[in-house]
């Protein structure tokens, strides 16, 4: 029993179980989102913890860690990523395409049949990575779609992907986000 207690004491936020337990605390989840996005959130609803999505029988299914919606109907998917996986066949890192797939599947349940597309709520897919995928040293990498011919022109689809880098060395993050990393 002592080994089990020692093993449990050594778990960190990087552990799937601990991450879900911590993020299931409403106050902590709200605070993390507020600090990261520099917004005020009054309340959140947990839509599902570890939601499994399999859009078609032959499609690749996924399991989303934490999905919440705030009081303005903005939807957030929070993921802890401890491995910088590569496709064994192509040797390419999978994180960029994984974020794209997660964003698409997050949207899949947000519209009912015959609802107009403009009713899609804003969404954030947030990957908390214990590695610096881009090797640039940023604490935060935020992505939105931009026009290549006019980089000032952003596609207003309200879909944002954020990759947090716990190994970051520069950029503006709050002390609370930094302590969350530690």
Locate each region found by the language model.
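Elongated, amphipathic alpha-helical interaction scaffolds
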Residues: 1-182
């Amino acid at each position: 029993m002592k080994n089990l207690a020692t093993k449990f004491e050594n778990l960190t936020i990087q552990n799937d179980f601990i991450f879900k337990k911590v993020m299931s605390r409403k106050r902590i989840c709200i605070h993390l989102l507020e600090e990261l996005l520099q917004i005020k959130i009054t309340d959140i609803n947990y839509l599902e913890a570890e939601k499994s999505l399999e859009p078609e029988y032959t499609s690749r299914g996924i399991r989303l860690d934490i999905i919440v919606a705030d009081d303005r109907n903005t939807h957030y998917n929070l993921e802890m990523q401890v491995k910088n996986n590569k496709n064994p066949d192509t040797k390419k890192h999978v994180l960029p395409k994984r974020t794209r797939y997660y964003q698409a599947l997050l949207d899949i349940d947000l519209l009912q049949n015959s609802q107009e597309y403009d009713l899609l709520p804003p969404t954030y897919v947030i990957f908390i990575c214990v590695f610096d995928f881009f090797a640039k040293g940023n604490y935060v990498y935020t992505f939105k779609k931009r026009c290549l011919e006019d980089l000032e022109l952003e596609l207003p689809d309200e879909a944002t992907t954020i990759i947090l880098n716990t190994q970051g060395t520069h950029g503006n993050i709050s002390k609370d986000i930094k302590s969350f990393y530690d």
